[in-house]
């Protein structure tokens, strides 16, 4: 039912960004259920996806459940789910190259912001793909912006070459991408 609903939503609202969050390793999660979730992630191709490993809390109902998943298994499943989403995010980023986006300029990028753009992001906790040409920022001044579907401190950023008016929406053209961020130029 949910796959059909998502397909109808996407058909009815072109360009919509669908986001969700999953907990990996909840007590009783079997390998088969996890594989079903992975298939759902791969088939649905969410625009934004968060994954968290279940953390046992003493005194909670779930904390007392049988079938607690070993940390190593949760970590492996987390990594596998995020790898699947990273592949989806890269494909979605690549598909946006050459397209125009309306972005909200947040601030001028500092050297520290730019260093983090092609190496590591605390937002995602994942190493960026720095081997691709599109994953690197060329020297120069950048504005950090957000797309219309991007939540601050959670989603990727749009690094726009040059200066945009901070606090305003501006149109940009996507010219590259990292795993989760876009690189753009003003239109």
Question: Where do the model's predicted regions map?
Answer:
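Terminal RNA-binding accessory module
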Residues: 64-187
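Conserved C-terminal portion of the radical SAM core fold
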Residues: 1-60, 78-92
